[in-house]
């Protein structure tokens, strides 16, 4: 399993948090139960207040699984995925 950092951004007009159908669906999607069918583990998530930007720290078999999991977010905005490492891994290999 590999670690990934994901950023999703959308326009205010398309904010899923304000949509009475989409908001609850996305909450369920980022839950452990929602991520499990994709083989993804959510280690953390946060939204930048007022910026319509959502970050996730995910563990998954590969980037393709992350993109599949992030599909609903891609319907309302952009999705960027970066391979990542824990601080412990970086120190062990002595480089970022």
Predicted region positions:
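Conserved short beta-strand edge segments in small beta-sheet-based binding/regulatory domains
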Residues: 76-88
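Short hydrophobic/aromatic beta-strand micro-patches
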Residues: 57-59
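Short active-site oxyanion
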Residues: 53-55, 78
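Short S/T/G/P-rich N-terminal loop/turn motif that feeds into the first structured element of a domain
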Residues: 1-36, 41-52, 61-64, 86-96
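Short amphipathic alpha-helices in soluble, non-transmembrane regions
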Residues: 66-74
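A short local loop/turn or secondary-structure capping micro-motif enriched for an aromatic residue
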Residues: 14-15, 75-77
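Acidic-histidine catalytic/liganding microenvironments
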Residues: 37, 73-76
